[in-house]
Amino acid sequence: MKQQIETLLNQAIERLKTKGVLKPEVTPVIKITHTTDPQHGDFATNLALTLSKAAGMSPHALAEKIVEALPPSGQITEVEIAGPGFINFFVTEGSYQTVVSSILKAGKDYGRSEMGKGQRVHMEYVSANPTGPLHVGHGRGAAYGACVANLLNAAGFEVHREYYVNDAGRQMGILALSVWVRYLQGYEASIELPKNAYQGEYIIDIAEALKAKYGKQFYHSVESIQAKIPEEIDSNADPEAYLDAWVTAQKDLLGPKDFECVFQAALDSILNDIKNDLEEFGVTYDDWFPESRLVREGLIQEGLDLLTKHGYVYEKNGAQWFRATALGDEKDRVLIRKNGLPTYFAADVAYHLHKFNQGYDQIIDIFGADHHGYIPRIRGFLKGLGKAPEKLHILLVQFAILYRGNEKVSMSTRGGTFVTLRELRHEVGNDAARFFYIMRKPDQHLDFDLELAKSQSNENPVYYIQYAHARICSVFRQLKTTQKNWDRPRGMENLSLLSTNYEKELLATLGRYPEVIKRAAMNYAPHLLAHYLQTLANQFHTYYNAERFLIEDDNLRNARLNLINAVQQIIRNGLTLLGVSAPEEM
């Protein structure tokens, strides 16, 4: 219906151009919204307010001329001007009833569009360091990213989903060291794990698997290790330097081959766990892109060469620096350290250069909110590379805060005292986790209420939505136990019998679904769909409690069954996009 109103408004604008009311070069941006109060009609537009300056008249006067120029329509009963110049449209009941036939005809494809046809989108999300299991904070980024990708796909975009595997940085060296020390403890209990190494039980599990497979192949005595640690490094005064000294000692003692063996065992174990965890959560990827590929394929050097060519690289104190301050950053950034090794920043440059080189129309990075400081530096180096920063959309997600009772649960990957995503999923279920993670705006703090997520009541939004779907399924199961039938074509012929306020509300809400999908996709806002489904479920439950469906009146029964079948389809379609199941029984 919105498209039909937009067409009518465009025709009215063309008529006003012909009459000289508007100049030929005026290009209107027509925005049509559903009204919140039925007394103000079904749809409204602020078109007259946006064009009044170009027309040289008041918004109200222009609104009058637009209304006069509107072509007649059999689906609009009344048009009125409200306030300073809003135009309200009242539509016929028949225009809403046609939505039922559209839904039942399209089925699982209802709401999908070709809005983004021909446009390719690259999405990167989660990309947690493979140094430990995913925790509940990562889960929100996973659920959000997967939902945004689903919504963009439903809107016609071709979406490439990618996980960036940080397999080449300092943290990975610390991970390998942590596993090695736990491995050594299996032979020599006196050795202590450095304070800032990874402490979790999963490290012990990897070490035990290493010991079972390789025996004492990687064993070295405490004395040989201590001999490699410079005496001037104090583990208490500078724990990070002490940790780095241990990593260096490990590499020296093991040699390249054995170190790589320990390193790879740790990486493979944790990365496989992450992959399995996400897959069980319904979050899948088209590609797992390793950071090591950037070096292997010369992408870091390519990025460095391009920045140098554009005059943004200089040398200082033996290191190579990016002149970031010239492009809006607060300080210049090191690209290549004086020891010749690239920084994380250099890897970011190379990875984004790789993304842009693939020719995507949009590139979406989903980061934790603690990465907000990365935004100006990323946009800066994109300018330095000669790439269009406007193609990049950086979406920030606040970490979820888990509460067990009134106690906030702390999370620290190195310390090992964190609640994993898998533990959360096992406690509240995938469906509740997926829904709760996305029912708020991503940049809002989320206090994850475990007790609410597990409750079976109308206070639990995901349960209430799923229960609406299950209730509809129960109506059709009950139908099979009676002598009554469901004649869908006959129901279509009698949709005009759906005249109660409950039915009118449901019909109007069903008609909004395609618009909700488009808005949620274009604004990267799955919470809009979550809120829509809550509204639809609430309206259905009210209808279910007020009316009966398996009645004697054949015409009304078939019309009502068609209506609730359409509600069932929309709930299932919407939940699928959110990664939530639509159970038939509860």
Swiss-Prot record:
<dbReference type="InterPro" id="IPR001278">
    <property type="entry name" value="Arg-tRNA-ligase"/>
</dbReference>
<dbReference type="GO" id="GO:0005524">
    <property type="term" value="F:ATP binding"/>
</dbReference>
<dbReference type="InterPro" id="IPR008909">
    <property type="entry name" value="DALR_anticod-bd"/>
</dbReference>
<dbReference type="InterPro" id="IPR005148">
    <property type="entry name" value="Arg-tRNA-synth_N"/>
</dbReference>
<dbReference type="InterPro" id="IPR001412">
    <property type="entry name" value="aa-tRNA-synth_I_CS"/>
</dbReference>
<dbReference type="Pfam" id="PF00750">
    <property type="entry name" value="tRNA-synt_1d"/>
</dbReference>
<dbReference type="InterPro" id="IPR014729">
    <property type="entry name" value="Rossmann-like_a/b/a_fold"/>
</dbReference>
<keyword id="KW-0030">Aminoacyl-tRNA synthetase</keyword>
<feature type="short sequence motif" description="'HIGH' region">
    <location>
        <begin position="128"/>
        <end position="138"/>
    </location>
</feature>
<keyword id="KW-0648">Protein biosynthesis</keyword>
<keyword id="KW-0067">ATP-binding</keyword>
<dbReference type="GO" id="GO:0006420">
    <property type="term" value="P:arginyl-tRNA aminoacylation"/>
</dbReference>
<comment type="similarity">
    <text>Belongs to the class-I aminoacyl-tRNA synthetase family.</text>
</comment>
<comment type="subunit">
    <text>Monomer.</text>
</comment>
<keyword id="KW-0963">Cytoplasm</keyword>
<keyword id="KW-0436">Ligase</keyword>
<dbReference type="GO" id="GO:0005737">
    <property type="term" value="C:cytoplasm"/>
</dbReference>
<dbReference type="InterPro" id="IPR035684">
    <property type="entry name" value="ArgRS_core"/>
</dbReference>
<dbReference type="Pfam" id="PF03485">
    <property type="entry name" value="Arg_tRNA_synt_N"/>
</dbReference>
<dbReference type="InterPro" id="IPR036695">
    <property type="entry name" value="Arg-tRNA-synth_N_sf"/>
</dbReference>
<dbReference type="Pfam" id="PF05746">
    <property type="entry name" value="DALR_1"/>
</dbReference>
<dbReference type="InterPro" id="IPR009080">
    <property type="entry name" value="tRNAsynth_Ia_anticodon-bd"/>
</dbReference>
<dbReference type="GO" id="GO:0004814">
    <property type="term" value="F:arginine-tRNA ligase activity"/>
</dbReference>
<keyword id="KW-0547">Nucleotide-binding</keyword>
<protein>
    <recommendedName>
        <fullName>Arginine--tRNA ligase</fullName>
        <ecNumber>6.1.1.19</ecNumber>
    </recommendedName>
</protein>
